[in-house]
Amino acid sequence: MSHPALTQLRALRYFDAIPALEPHLLDWLLLEDSMTKRFEQQGKRVSVTLIREAFVGQSEVEEASGLLPSESRYWLREILLCADGEPWLAGRTVVPESTLCGPEQVLQHLGKTPLGRYLFTSSTLTRDFIEIGRDATLWGRRSRLRLSGKPLLLTELFLPASPLY
């Protein structure tokens, strides 16, 4: 199963540098904290619609080439993050199999738990970068995060109902 928003997410084109945008947009796009928490601060009940969770080969995560270690298998999680049942964000997480050792194994078992609820409670979380992307009228971003120094790639597309717009 797939979702049209995930097709748009994969079509994001990234800026080489942070573009000159309205402060309101940058506030959302460069947020270092949990997007789940940010949505909850809007007074909304946040839920996850799980689209896909599975191990995949390198050919299904080409966007991670050069950003993550080259491995034969990656854990792929694709979701819609909803606020009061309305999709606000499409998310795609790519995790190298080598990252999934020790406590990070929990990344395979999040189910309908928002990724941010796990990541941002970890004292070992660091972020290497945030890149801003755009596809037609929609904004997105991607970040390489590390848990205990082990990388994962998180890509987010802000959907039209999102307060970013």
Swiss-Prot record:
Domain of life of the source: Bacteria
Coiled-coil stretches: none
Principal place of residence: cytoplasm
Residues the entry annotates as binding substrate: M35, R77, L115, E156
Gene Ontology MF term list: chorismate lyase activity
Pfam families named among the record's database cross-references: Chor_lyase
Chemical reaction(s) catalysed: chorismate = 4-hydroxybenzoate + pyruvate
Keywords recorded for this protein, A-Z: Cytoplasm, Lyase, Pyruvate, Ubiquinone biosynthesis
GO BP term (any one): ubiquinone biosynthetic process
InterPro entries: Chorismate--pyruvate_lyase (IPR007440), Chorismate_lyase_/UTRA_dom_sf (IPR028978)
Cell compartment(s), UniProt: Cytoplasm
Cellular-component GO terms for this entry: cytosol
EC annotation from Swiss-Prot or TrEMBL: 4.1.3.40
Biological pathway: Cofactor biosynthesis; ubiquinone biosynthesis
Family: Belongs to the UbiC family.
Subunit structure: Monomer.
Function text: Removes the pyruvyl group from chorismate, with concomitant aromatization of the ring, to provide 4-hydroxybenzoate (4HB) for the ubiquinone pathway.
Protein name: Chorismate pyruvate-lyase
Organism in which the protein naturally occurs: Salmonella typhimurium (strain LT2 / SGSC1412 / ATCC 700720)
Recorded name of the encoding gene: ubiC
